[in-house]
């Protein structure tokens, strides 16, 4: 969390007014903990939050969580587990499952990129 907080503070001190976070696997958990503990950001993306491996039960009410992506074959971030948990994080967040992808998205990088870029483009145009 200290690294995330330091990076966000650096950006804010540099005059960046809108700060978004994206984290993959362990990074999704670290970002969620920091935001859950009060770190102020605008939007957050979680890619394959490792709910089968790390306890996410203390994380709730992440109003800035906008997108969660996982793969249908991800055994570290199983779609069914993530789908049950994300309403406690933010029921308004978009939940996307990439069919056939495992935790590492091998062969599905283009689909992951498309999901992320579609979301980012929608935020940039609004």
Give the label of every model feature segment.
Residues 1-14:
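Alpha/beta-hydrolase active-site loop
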Residues 40-51:
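A conserved short beta-strand
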Residues 64, 78-86:
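Short alpha-helix in the alpha/beta-hydrolase fold that links the catalytic acid
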Residues 72-77, 103-104:
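Acidic catalytic loop of the alpha/beta-hydrolase fold
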Residues 88-104:
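Catalytic histidine neighborhood in serine/cysteine hydrolases
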Residues 101-113:
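Catalytic histidine-centered segment of alpha/beta-hydrolase-like enzymes
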């Amino acid at each position: 969390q200290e690294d995330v907080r330091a990076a966000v503070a650096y950006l804010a001190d540099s005059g960046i007014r809108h700060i978004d976070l994206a984290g993959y696997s362990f990074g999704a958990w670290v970002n969620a903990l920091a935001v859950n503990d009060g770190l102020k950001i605008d939007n957050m993306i979680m890619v394959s939050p490792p709910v089968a491996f790390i306890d996410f039960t203390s994380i709730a009410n992440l109003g800035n969580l906008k997108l969660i992506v996982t793969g249908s074959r991800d055994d570290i971030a199983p779609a069914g587990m993530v789908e049950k948990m994300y309403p406690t994080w933010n029921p308004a967040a978009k939940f996307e499952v990439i069919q056939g992808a495992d935790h590492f998205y091998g062969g599905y990088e283009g689909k992951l990129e498309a999901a992320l870029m579609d979301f980012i483009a929608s935020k940039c145009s609004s």
